[in-house]
Amino acid sequence: MNLIESINAAQLRTDIPDFRPGDTVRVHAKVVEGTRERIQMFEGVVIARKNSGINETYTVRKISNGVGVERIFPVHTPRVEQIEVIRHGKVRRAKLYYLRALTGKKARIAERRR
């Protein structure tokens, strides 16, 4: 293992739950406002996971006041306190970008049986 791989391996988090695109998650993100730091929750559907290793990210989409909001979080960042999986969705795609065009009941995802 070379130097870069050993540094990256030391920074990987091990407390990440198993989640896939289509799952509804609640992300507890640390937000710094001036000198204060607080936890902000962002709950939505995972529409994509990209890259691997230390560079891995996931995109979470939610509808807030009728407007679609998406946030991209790095998987291994210390800024994310916790990731809760609320429900597991049954989808047949790795990237759910088509959900951006759907509204209301059409944007629902069936629950996966475990």
Curated annotation (Swiss-Prot):
Physiological role: This protein is located at the 30S-50S ribosomal subunit interface and may play a role in the structure and function of the aminoacyl-tRNA binding site.
Cross-referenced NCBIfam families: rplS_bact (TIGR01024)
GO CC field: cytosolic large ribosomal subunit
Lineage, highest ranks first: Bacteria, Bacillati, Bacillota, Bacilli, Lactobacillales
GO MF annotation list: structural constituent of ribosome
GO biological process, one term: translation
Name of the protein this chain belongs to: Large ribosomal subunit protein bL19
Keyword annotations from UniProtKB, A to Z: Ribonucleoprotein, Ribosomal protein
UniProt similarity note: Belongs to the bacterial ribosomal protein bL19 family.
